[in-house]
Amino acid sequence: TAYDDALFDYHMSSELLLVDPAGGRTQTIGETAHYTMAEFSPDGAYLLIERLVGPWSHEVAWWRFASEVEVWSPDGQLVASIASLPLADAVPIHGVPLGPRVIDWRSTAPHTLFWVEALDGGNPVASVSHRDRLMKLEAPFDGEATEIFRAEHRIISTGAWTDDGATLMLTERERIKRWRYVWLIDVETGESKVWYDLDEDDRYNDPGNPVYRPLDNGHWVLRQKGDMVYFRGSGASPEGDRPFLDRRELGGSATERLFRCDPDRYEYFNAFAGDENHFVFRSESS
């Protein structure tokens, strides 16, 4: 109803403010809108914005509404339009919308955007050689985006950057077999290799998820020590979950277990305390 539309307008409307943490001064950026994303580039020179645009559909959830993805200057001036995404009300079951998705800054570059695009029309049953591709666009965002990588299956994760700055950890998923392939991609040269693969249903052999650390620019990279990166997991076993912390060779197969919870209590890695030689874990017992 019109009342539902008015409620959505009211609850989704927001303003963007820059806040000086020292003095508490604030500065409004842009106009009031229905923002779903506002993220500065690593060097602070640009702002990545996504805002919903009406009319509002009563058939799909809000994250399928039409939206505009833009790059602004820090004072709210439009620099470039990245994508005008239409209402996604005809997405196939298990499919994805058309156009750029998972749009984000490269954590280890001043101002470079990456995103994923479907090559199969978003239709998971379409017969194609590749389903997705990874795209790159650098400032000033007025040229054509560059294709970096083509995936045979659907890309489901692209947010893990290594300390060296040029390597992206990307995950693609084979839907029918419920299988995942984890790639390492050099986004400067385009070189890529499968690091490891896993069965989604084999919880006993699940290697877990990467541990991250924040950069001074507010973005995140993999927690890394030399050629080793850190993984944490729930540690499913016949005795129940026994969470663990591992150190894995980046691009290789060597793994070192640093911690695993005892079977008579429940413990899990929480965070590193300073360097990689100390960490905090939580312990629970009955």
Indicate residue ranges for each PLM-predicted region:
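Beta-propeller folds
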Residues: T1-S286
